[in-house]
């Protein structure tokens, strides 16, 4: 089934249920059952990757946070803070069928004009790009992998 396709992330034991052709899972961060879309499948895997493989505390991970950009409401997929409440990681998730293009990078860069986060990630579950932003020297560097928390 394409909806639950394997991703380039470790598999996690989600509790998936099917009802009338819709698949759902329990989102442990939002504490509710959600419908699985291809983008949500990627988001849920990446959240588990952050928690289980990279050591990010789940209490510091926010999902689909609202923000205003040039007067328009937007939503970030994943925003992680440190224990001081400072934003440290912004993740933009796309469905596996969505190519990671310059337009996707432009989108996350626009979001980061608001958030000013030092680590950015763009993923479609198959490809992952990690970037460290140096605001002082106005530059960025792509990273081979996401740093541990």
Predicted ranges, named:
Residues 1-119, 126-149:
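A short, conserved, highly charged catalytic patch centered on acidic carboxylates
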């Amino acid at each position: 089934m394409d909806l639950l396709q394997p991703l380039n992330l470790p598999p996690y034991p989600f509790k998936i249920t099917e009802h009338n052709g819709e698949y759902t899972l329990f989102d442990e961060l939002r504490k509710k059952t959600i419908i699985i879309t291809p983008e949500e499948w990627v988001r849920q895997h990446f959240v588990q990757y952050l928690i289980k493989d990279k050591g990010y505390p789940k209490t510091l991970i926010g999902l689909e946070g609202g923000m205003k950009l040039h007067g328009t409401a937007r939503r970030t997929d994943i925003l992680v803070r440190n224990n001081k409440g400072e934003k440290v990681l912004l993740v933009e998730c796309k469905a596996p069928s969505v190519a990671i293009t310059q337009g996707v990078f432009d989108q996350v860069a626009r979001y980061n004009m608001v958030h000013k986060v030092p680590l950015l990630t763009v993923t479609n579950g198959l490809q992952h790009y990690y970037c460290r932003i140096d605001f002082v020297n106005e530059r960025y560097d792509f990273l081979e992998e996401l740093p541990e928390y």
